[in-house]
From Swiss-Prot:
Presence of the UniProt keyword Membrane in the record: no
Organism: Aeromonas hydrophila subsp. hydrophila (strain ATCC 7966 / DSM 30187 / BCRC 13018 / CCUG 14551 / JCM 1027 / KCTC 2358 / NCIMB 9240 / NCTC 8049)
Free-text function comment from the UniProt entry: Prevents the cell division inhibition by proteins MinC and MinD at internal division sites while permitting inhibition at polar sites. This ensures cell division at the proper site by restricting the formation of a division septum at the midpoint of the long axis of the cell.
GO biological process terms on file: cell division; regulation of division septum assembly
A Pfam family recorded for this sequence: MinE
UniProt keyword annotation of Iron present: no
Membership in a protein family: Belongs to the MinE family.
Keywords, alphabetical: Cell cycle, Cell division
Protein name: Cell division topological specificity factor
Signal peptide feature range: none
Record SUPFAM superfamilies: Cell division protein MinE topological specificity domain
Amino acid sequence: MSLLDYFRSNKKQSTAQLAKERLQIIVAHERSSRGGPDYLPQLKQDILDVIRKYVQIDPDKITVQLDKKSDELSVLELNITFADDKKG
């Protein structure tokens, strides 16, 4: 095999390798579109249960967001709009 034959050859990936790469792309896409770790809904519920012990809150006025700043830093942001208790 000459050097020119090496560069001319059309190297084909095996079917298994191609399927593996496609699956990795699909899994990465699913993870990124999922929006957060699996424990996030339960964490949100636990935090809200504690807050409800002290004040009334409207579940529609709550937002929870997990932002990944880097590989080592994630920020959990919890925004709650409290009802106005002022009368008269």
